[in-house]
């Protein structure tokens, strides 16, 4: 017998050829969870195999209500512009190979999204992608030195355009006023940033993908 939770699972049709599981013996693709991962995979498959039927199973009342919700994730275009863990310092030298690899993958995502926009699958890109500066922060001699080295390595790479660096209070207070407020003037701080960053609303992106299915 199905449990209470199983009874709550909802079916979302994703293509003209998809029909509910109660009326069909099988479908070509069953996607579990109506979040960004299922929506993206479904969009890929509709492009590559448009004759395949698809169905999404979701336990909640609407798609993109868990990790894909804009309130439940950072919402950044994940391109290693400000994430310091992708640029470790090893024996005094900053390594950027991982940051480059992550950025390249994000550019592939942007190409796919652009194609979907051009195909009118995603009708309103401003609803889910917008420019926003990505900023890194360092405090103390060691972190400031690291941030400067990181900036120097990334500044000349084409995947990290318009990278900037400042180790004075004025730019810090301008860019990060809430972090600057109440901080002692004696604190040695630095920031690096680029205006090439993006803010992504994965919930809105998910819903546009599913609405077009």
Regions found by a protein language model. Give the residues of each.
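Short, flexible, mixed-charge acidic loops at enzyme active sites
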Residues: 70-74, 181-182
């Amino acid at each position: 017998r199905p449990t209470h939770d199983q009874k709550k699972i909802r079916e979302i049709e994703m293509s003209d050829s998809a029909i509910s599981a109660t009326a069909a013996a099988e479908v070509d693709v069953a996607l579990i969870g109506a979040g960004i991962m299922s929506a993206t995979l479904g969009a890929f498959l509709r492009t590559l195999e448009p004759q395949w039927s698809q169905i999404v199973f979701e336990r909640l009342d609407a798609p993109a209500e868990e990790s894909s919700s804009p309130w439940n994730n950072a919402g950044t275009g994940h391109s290693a512009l400000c994430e310091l863990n992708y640029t470790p310092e090893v024996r005094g030298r900053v390594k950027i190979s991982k940051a480059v690899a992550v950025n390249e993958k994000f550019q592939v995502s942007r190409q796919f999204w652009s194609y979907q926009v051009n195909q009118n699958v995603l009708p309103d890109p401003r609803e889910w992608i917008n420019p926003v500066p990505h900023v890194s922060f360092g405090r103390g001699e060691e972190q400031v030195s690291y941030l400067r080295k990181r900036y120097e390595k990334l500044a000349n790479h084409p995947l990290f355009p318009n990278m900037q660096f400042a180790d004075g209070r004025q730019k810090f207070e301008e860019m990060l006023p809430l972090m600057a407020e109440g901080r002692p003037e004696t604190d040695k701080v630095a920031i690096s940033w680029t205006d090439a960053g993006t803010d992504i609303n994965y919930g809105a992106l998910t819903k546009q993908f599913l609405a077009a299915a």
